[in-house]
Amino acid sequence: MNAFSKFSQKQFRVFFSYKNNPVKLFSLFLFIQFFAVCNSEQNSEKKEILFRLISEFQIDLQKNLESAIRTKGIVGAIDVCRTISPQKEADLKKEFPGVLIKRISEKPRNPNHRPEVWETEIFNQWKESQKTGMAPYTVVLSKDREVRILQPIVLQSPTCLQCHGGPQDINPAVSKKIAELYPNDQAKGYKLGELRGAFSATW
């Protein structure tokens, strides 16, 4: 017997035991309604916070990368990208216990950034939508007390191609540095406008 069946039977037994007591039955319905409203309000608040954190993550990463490119060049910026993203993920997890925000991709540079099953399903939805001309869209999933958000990352700047484009876009020195840091790198061969990955948030 699965967990849902057990839960349903338990609900039925509670309802049956209360059916001859209108006061208890009314109280039960009020409790269920209150619980549902509380969950909905809590998830709504979580969603707002997650969107804000994703935005801050994206802005901080872009700001630091642009600064590193100006001062250290593309090769030096690779090290910055390699360290700042995991550090930002760890800082958010520490500041907001239970929150997990990370960048993921089906063609990751960091092997720890591969998508989970539910994320892969959404990637597949995005790819099917793109065939009809629809751009990837942000997906929000809410169930019980958990909220999940997947926000697409699309390559929009020619600068991104200097690390993620084809052989004609990537300087040999950059290719060498990437190979040293990421021997199993898959995050190349992209074109402008293509789906690079996503910001994934769970709370």
Question: In which residue ranges do the predicted regions lie?
Answer:
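Hydrophobic helical h-region of N-terminal Sec-dependent signal peptides
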Residues: 28-32
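Short, cysteine/histidine-rich loop/knuckle motifs that typically chelate Zn2+
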Residues: 162
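Bacterial N-terminal signal peptides that target proteins for export
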Residues: 4-26
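Extracytoplasmic c-type cytochrome modules immediately beyond a signal peptide or single-pass transmembrane anchor
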Residues: 41-159, 169-203
